[in-house]
């Protein structure tokens, strides 16, 4: 009989744990946070881990607490994520991300004719919509284009 073994990720002393990330989105979360091989602190992540509500991803980042802008970006691709702030190996704060009603300069409009994609100095602006069936979608306030499946690929 095979013995069941659990894979454990080392606890972090100070930093952030992002839990309940939509399965398969951990690498996009790292991209949103601009974490690359040049980042010198410890970063660990698990993708497609079994959870009580199905599969999920988890990201742990030593020595970093997230800004409101970073939380808003994560909410766009993973609206059910939770953020745990860790200090001295203890969770001192636990919050769910909050999906903003409006984002500016965060996502590129996919409509090549949109004024926000021209040489004009105009930031993209989207209203944020959430439905249980379709998840998150963004509605461009300039050209009316709707983005739903491609949000992660168009983050600025």
UniProtKB/Swiss-Prot annotation:
Zn(2+) binds at residues 109, 114, 140, 143. It comes from the Archaea. Binds 1 zinc ion per subunit. GO terms for molecular function: metal ion binding. One of its GO terms (biological process) is 'de novo' pyrimidine nucleobase biosynthetic process. Keywords: Metal-binding, Pyrimidine biosynthesis, Zinc. InterPro entries: Asp_carbamoyltransf_reg_N (IPR020545), Asp_carbamoylTrfase_reg (IPR002801), Asp_carbamoyltrfase_reg_C (IPR020542), Asp_carbatrfase_reg_C_sf (IPR036792), Asp_carbatrfase_reg_N_sf (IPR036793). Signal peptide: none annotated. Contains catalytic and regulatory chains. Involved in allosteric regulation of aspartate carbamoyltransferase. This is Aspartate carbamoyltransferase regulatory chain. It comes from Methanosarcina acetivorans (strain ATCC 35395 / DSM 2834 / JCM 12185 / C2A). The lineage of its organism: Archaea, Methanobacteriati, Methanobacteriota, Stenosarchaea group, Methanomicrobia.
